[in-house]
Swiss-Prot record:
Subcellular location: Cytoplasm
Assembly and binders: Homodimer.
A GO CC term assigned to this protein in UniProt: cytosol
Biological classification of the source: Bacteria, Bacillati, Bacillota, Bacilli, Bacillales
Location, primary (coarse class): cytoplasm
Record organism: Staphylococcus epidermidis (strain ATCC 35984 / DSM 28319 / BCRC 17069 / CCUG 31568 / BM 3577 / RP62A)
Protein name: 4-hydroxy-tetrahydrodipicolinate synthase
Gene: dapA
Known catalytic reactions: L-aspartate 4-semialdehyde + pyruvate = (2S,4S)-4-hydroxy-2,3,4,5-tetrahydrodipicolinate + H2O + H(+)
Gene Ontology BP term (one): lysine biosynthetic process via diaminopimelate
Amino acid sequence: MTHMFEGVGVALATPFTNNEVDFDALERHVQFLLDNNIQAIIVNGTTAESPTLTDEEKEKVLATVVKLVNHNVPVIAGTGTNNTYKSIQASIRAKEIGADAVMLITPYYNKTNQRGLIQHFETIANEVKLPVILYNVPSRTNMTIEPETVEILSHNPYIVALKDATNDFEYFDEVKQRINANEFALYSGNDDNVVKFYQRGGNGVISVIANVIPQEFQYLYDNRQNETDITNYFKPIEKLLEALSLDVNPIPIKVLTAYLGYGHYEVRLPLVPLEEAQCKQVERAFEQFKAGEQ
């Protein structure tokens, strides 16, 4: 079995202009990513500000991306919620629109136990019959998919991958020991750990920063066998990532998507923009990176 993708998937930011989704900017941004050879596009996830998108907006964003991508790379829709049956409905609709897979976050707020997680994910997968990427991000959900749970879920034919945003390599190593690496992919959900993630056998990344430096991030994957090369190549990227850590994602990355002309610098409440001085700091870090300064 081949994996859903190998290399860089981009967690797509949603451009806004006057608090409305800017579909012209969205199309230009997606074309930029395709022109730079990214391997997958993930829509309606955390970086997309999905909690503040309406169902209609999510569907229209997905339809726009699916049409533009035209089967050249997988389009993966974030459809997971803390309500199993709403997740099923959203996933079925994504399938109808043309998504190649869905990404399901662990239930948040109401949470559950590991037995509940298994039933939650398998109920969705078996009903929707579309490839599923599990999304483990305990920093946002206060809920972890334990390694033994990943192992159980990996036997479901529709559950094909894990996006691991734990930044915990003991967790990663245990998961990797428990799964069939030929059939189940492991993607990093943390841009700052990709070098180490690749060195330990990860299959790729679902990246935020690749919204603006897709080619550079794909280079890291393409040259992952050369540890010295990618370690050195990554050093200036680390400096840019430091600037993007000024606030919660996607607040800082949208400074740069706007800087590149993909919509205005807008986020929806409860998110608020960076202060002007912080915006300048992020832009300056990006300019220095592009100029090759370290």
